[in-house]
Amino acid sequence: MVGKPLRWMMTNHLNQKPLSLSGIPWFCYVISIASTCIAVGLQWDISWHMTIGRDTFWTPAHMVIYLGGILGGFTSAILVFNMTFFDKNEGMNSGVKFWGFTGPMAAWVCIWGTVAMLTSAPFDDWWHNAYGLDVEIISPPHMVLAAGFIAIVFGAMLLTLVQQNRSNVSNINLYSWLYTYTGGILILLMVILTTEYSFTNKHHSLEFYKISAIVYPVVLVAISKSSKLKWPATIAALICMFHRCIMVWVLPLFEGQPLLAPIYREITHFVPPPFPVLLFIPAIAVDLIIIKSDKMNDWVRSAAIGFTFVSLFFVVQWYFSEFLLSESARNWFFSGHFNKPYWSRMGPYEFKFWEYDYRGFGPPIPLTPVSIAGLFSVTLIAAISARVGFWWGEWMRQVKR
């Protein structure tokens, strides 16, 4: 009795018309919502720690994060269940077998991500009980959590990408939009994970540009190479920026105050993240180079993207960061005066470029000044990152399982 309605809802989800909106299967929307929950919850959780301190596990921010994980895992489990028991022909043609079950590759990636996220919860609680408060975002339990939510977002990209690669002309743009949207969420996750290396005060240091050259070109190139939209890298970068700006503008609307010492500044509302980098500007160049150089060798294209990315990103962020530290940015739009946590001591250093990396433990670490030789090494890193992006993007174009 239960199997019939489930079979009616799920049968031939790739070839027939399942429950859908505008011809797009329901699971594509749900998995995109799951990715959004993860991104929103992560930024909210970081703001919660910067505003209130460590709280119970059952905070609303944590619940939004794990809602995203459970949505992604549950949706993927339904797809695996359907392909294993109801849609065996499709499973033989396009499924991936694991432990006797058959499902789309993207579903297995999401399920693994959900398991990792759920495993990280007790691990993180034990870590805090054993070692106290976190002084950095990057800790062993947080890396397990990060592996989980990156897997879910990557699985969401794969799920919508398969639909794009197998769809007809009538709805291919809708799949491409969902794919590019989840790609924008992946870029946002990279922004979140590198927060401590990319404070505005570090934008005149070589370390900031090295980190940016590692994480951004690879994703931008892969999205631009595999999406069938026009200007996909630019759209993904704008989606990332839009999400970040929404958090900058919305979080300070809600009241909050510190509950855990030491408290070095008065906080009355939730602390927003720093204003996002202007990644869409070099993303335009990435799209343009890929469009105009289709017949060129990928190594040459990677070198061109590496040089162009670093040139544009360096010039834009060098001067934009000066603006963000000025009095002109101390308003609700840019939030230049209100993005430091309550445990950060107040002082003139808040609005200056740092010469040292001030960590939560140990002595300050000197930051490397930007130089011509340093920018050359950053360009080389960006070119290698772009080349990996070409490999990744070419593989993504061929994914149909």
Predicted features, each with a name:
Residues 37-42, 116-122, 185-196, 238-252, ...:
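Aromatic-anchored segments of alpha-helical transmembrane domains
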Residues 235-287, 296-386:
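Alpha-helical transmembrane segments of multi-pass membrane proteins
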Residues 94-110, 122-181, 195-206:
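Membrane-interface helix-loop-helix junctions at boundaries between adjacent transmembrane segments
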Residues 23-36, 101-115, 169-183, 228-239, ...:
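Membrane-interfacial loop-to-transmembrane alpha-helix junctions, especially the N-terminal start
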Residues 3-4, 63-81, 143-160, 210-228, ...:
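Hydrophobic cores of alpha-helical transmembrane segments in multi-pass inner/ER membrane proteins
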Residues 2-24, 85-105, 163-179, 396-401:
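Membrane-interfacial, low-structure loops and terminal tails that flank and connect transmembrane helices
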Residues 43-63, 123-143, 192-212, 248-269, ...:
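Membrane-interface interhelical loops and short amphipathic "cap" helices
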